[in-house]
Amino acid sequence: MHLIDYLLLLLVGLLALSHGQLHVEHDGESCSNSSHQQILETGEGSPSLKIAPANADFAFRFYYLIASETPGKNIFFSPLSISAAYAMLSLGACSHSRSQILEGLGFNLTELSESDVHRGFQHLLHTLNLPGHGLETRVGSALFLSHNLKFLAKFLNDTMAVYEAKLFHTNFYDTVGTIQLINDHVKKETRGKIVDLVSELKKDVLMVLVNYIYFKALWEKPFISSRTTPKDFYVDENTTVRVPMMLQDQEHHWYLHDRYLPCSVLRMDYKGDATVFFILPNQGKMREIEEVLTPEMLMRWNNLLRKRNFYKKLELHLPKFSISGSYVLDQILPRLGFTDLFSKWADLSGITKQQKLEASKSFHKATLDVDEAGTEAAAATSFAIKFFSAQTNRHILRFNRPFLVVIFSTSTQSVLFLGKVVDPTKP
């Protein structure tokens, strides 16, 4: 299973292509006196676990907002990519803008310090980028900076040290060259899965921040391609589509039918440190399940599915498909607490003192492919549950109607991708 996800954040004037020298402003004062580099290199335990609850809360708040506005549509995004990008941006935000970003991401700054937040992301990104058997996860960021603007050394140093961001200085007036530079970098880092991410840029942009996630994982129990056949998928009461349906009927899996909620939950493992939860609402109950989809509910299901009595032999039917999601974040995030960031009231003076910056446009794109071997990009899958007669007592799971999917990093307790598959034939 492979996952790829990209986020492009454009701040007013943030980009250009040239081979000139990058001007770093050493004399300017940052709005924060704390040294994230020194703080983050110390610490004990697993700092990423401290930020996991807030990251999960943001994931489900973002999902609920999208789902409420686009009923009947596929959804797919990487909350981790969005959170990491904006947490990095907060290094250059000051006063109310900095607190709005961090609190908008779900962090309670009276319980968790800013240094704890950045330490958590540093540990999280480092852990996810470690090589693993059968699992490849790559998370990265890049800053494309105008060579005509002087950037504060502390902001650049912290983004490189904490978020391992790569810096590119460019001539922003060379629009064609700048777009080519960004797209070539994204294409390379995403193994060719995302091409032509940027099609146009305004010349008042001074910086572009790009964050991406590439996730490629193999099923712990793969499907056999010769057993994949066309089957019906019931989008709604009036729409049925044909999809290539994979089959697995000799394996045991972790699944349950929730006795308190109208849904079934399946957990499937990938090789390495990742797992996926497929949540199948009963017919007509999708909205009811979406309303109770919280970090606490996900942990409840996860804890239940550790019990041996939920490990059962299944006849499993899962569609082979590709979906994607694209979101204009500057229209979404203000409703999640980022009230001033995309306005003239934004304070990004921790990036440069030379001139005032505003966040102009922010985009997020995620793609997912699911096949017999695993998944590429971000993943979502749907299934229905059905039982044979009492005489056979055999369990069948059919992913043949809309469902929810959560891809999860076990060691960091992080939601990597979250989505809903309504129509697996729609990209």
From Swiss-Prot:
Residues of the signal peptide: 1-20
Protein name: Kallistatin
Species for this entry: Homo sapiens (Human)
PANTHER family (alphabetical): KALLISTATIN, SERINE PROTEASE INHIBITOR, SERPIN
Entry-linked Pfam families: Serpin
Gene Ontology molecular-function annotations: serine-type endopeptidase inhibitor activity
Residues marked Reactive bond (site): 388-389
Main localization (coarse): secreted
Post-translational modification: The N-terminus is blocked.
